[in-house]
């Protein structure tokens, strides 16, 4: 039984050594040029990802800042001394002031269409 256990152990070690040696040689079966090329490709892909992210974030930031600046600029223009805006502001203010000052003078007016026929006015 000792020889069988020893044989099993020996076969296991032999197969393990052959398999590991084969897999290591298969994995490392590349030339130095191929390894250098693979390292360069890996590095370039990573740098292009960073460059891509920087460009995308920059474009997004530019658009956001442009929208913000245009909004602030248009709001500032609304409150400027431009004649169009002054006309609207003064016109509405005068209209409301005159209505408030003459509230007691307001009267109800009824207009009657004398040309309408077929309708009678109830007393």
Curated annotation (Swiss-Prot):
InterPro entries reported in the protein's UniProt record: K_chnl_KCNE, K_chnl_volt-dep_bsu_KCNE2
Stretches in topological domain Cytoplasmic: 70-123
Glycosylation sites: 6, 29
GO terms under biological process: establishment of localization in cell; iodide transport; multicellular organismal response to stress; myo-inositol transport; negative regulation of delayed rectifier potassium channel activity; potassium ion transmembrane transport; protein localization; regulation of ventricular cardiac muscle cell membrane repolarization
Localization, UniProt: Cell membrane; Apical cell membrane
An annotated Gene Ontology molecular function: voltage-gated potassium channel activity
This protein's UniProt keywords: Cell membrane, Glycoprotein, Ion channel, Ion transport, Membrane, Potassium, Potassium channel, Potassium transport, Transmembrane, Transmembrane helix, Transport, Voltage-gated channel
Any Pfam family the entry gives: ISK_Channel
GO cellular component labels: apical plasma membrane; membrane; plasma membrane; voltage-gated potassium channel complex
Keyword Glycoprotein: yes
Effect of inactivating the gene: Mutant mice show increased pentylenetetrazole-induced seizure susceptibility and mortality associated with a reduction of myo-inositol concentration in cerebrospinal fluid.
Membrane topology listed for this record: Single-pass type I membrane protein; Single-pass membrane protein
Keyword match Lipoprotein: no
Listed transmembrane segments: 49-69
PANTHER family named among the record's database cross-references: POTASSIUM VOLTAGE-GATED CHANNEL SUBFAMILY E MEMBER 1, 3, POTASSIUM VOLTAGE-GATED CHANNEL SUBFAMILY E MEMBER 2
Function of the protein: Ancillary protein that functions as a regulatory subunit of the voltage-gated potassium (Kv) channel complex composed of pore-forming and potassium-conducting alpha subunits and of regulatory beta subunits. KCNE2 beta subunit modulates the gating kinetics and enhances stability of the channel complex. Alters the gating of the delayed rectifier Kv channel containing KCNB1 alpha subunit. Associates with KCNH2/HERG alpha subunit Kv channel to form the rapidly activating component of the delayed rectifying potassium current (IKr) in heart.
Subunit (UniProt): Interacts with KCNB1. Associates with KCNH2/ERG1. May associate with KCNQ2 and KCNQ3. Associates with HCN1 and probably HCN2. Heteromultimer with KCNC2. Interacts with KCNC2. Interacts with KCNQ1. Forms a heterooligomer complex with KCNQ1 that targets to the membrane raft and leading to currents with an apparently instantaneous activation, a rapid deactivation process and a linear current-voltage relationship and decreases the amplitude of the outward current.
Family: Belongs to the potassium channel KCNE family.
Name under which the protein is recorded: Potassium voltage-gated channel subfamily E member 2
């Amino acid at each position: 039984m000792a020889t069988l256990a020893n044989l099993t152990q020996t076969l296991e070690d032999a197969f393990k050594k052959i398999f590991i040696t084969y897999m290591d040689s298969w994995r490392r079966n590349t030339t130095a040029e191929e390894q250098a090329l693979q390292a360069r490709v890996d590095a370039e892909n990573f740098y292009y990802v960073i460059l891509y992210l920087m460009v995308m974030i920059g474009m997004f930031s530019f658009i956001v800042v442009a929208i913000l600046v245009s909004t602030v600029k248009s709001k500032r223009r609304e409150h400027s001394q431009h004649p169009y805006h002054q006309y609207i502001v003064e016109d509405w203010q005068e209209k409301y002031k005159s209505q408030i000052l003459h509230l007691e003078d307001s009267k109800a007016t009824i207009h009657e269409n004398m040309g309408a026929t077929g309708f009678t006015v109830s007393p």
